[in-house]
């Protein structure tokens, strides 16, 4: 009896689906409160005005309005939701 299995029989066979992360709403698009703006791991994009962050770093709109992306002095990417407009 062989001590090892045939070559690679049980180690292959995985091809996990992607996790659909990324920017879901782009700048100057209109959103409703609760809309997901960004799905991410860690804070690649930081929450700005009227944007909340979930425990998995998902950013979402807190109010109805228009999305605006910007950079801070420290070169951080920030997403905000501007009311009205």
Swiss-Prot record:
InterPro entries reported in the protein's UniProt record: Ribosomal_bL27 (IPR001684)
An MF annotation (GO) of this entry: structural constituent of ribosome
Keyword terms of this UniProt record: Ribonucleoprotein, Ribosomal protein
GO CC annotation terms, alphabetical: cytosolic large ribosomal subunit
One Pfam family cited in the UniProt record for this chain: Ribosomal_L27
Chain spans, region Disordered: 1-22
GO biological process: translation
Domain of life: Bacteria
PANTHER family, per the entry: LARGE RIBOSOMAL SUBUNIT PROTEIN BL27M (PTHR15893:SF0), RIBOSOMAL PROTEIN L27 (PTHR15893)
Similarity comment: Belongs to the bacterial ribosomal protein bL27 family.
The protein's name: Large ribosomal subunit protein bL27
Originating species: Anaeromyxobacter dehalogenans (strain 2CP-C)
Organismal lineage: Bacteria, Pseudomonadati, Myxococcota, Myxococcia, Myxococcales
Encoding gene, per UniProt annotation: rpmA
């Amino acid at each position: 009896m062989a001590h090892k299995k045939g070559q690679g029989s049980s180690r292959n066979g995985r091809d996990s689906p992607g996790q659909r992360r990324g920017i879901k709403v782009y700048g100057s698009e209109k959103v409703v409160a609760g809309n997901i703006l960004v799905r991410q791991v860690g804070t690649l994009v930081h929450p700005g005005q009227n944007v909340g962050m979930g425990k998995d770093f998902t950013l979402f709109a807190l109010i109805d309005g228009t999305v605006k992306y910007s950079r801070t002095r420290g070169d951080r990417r920030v997403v905000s939701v501007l009311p009205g407009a």
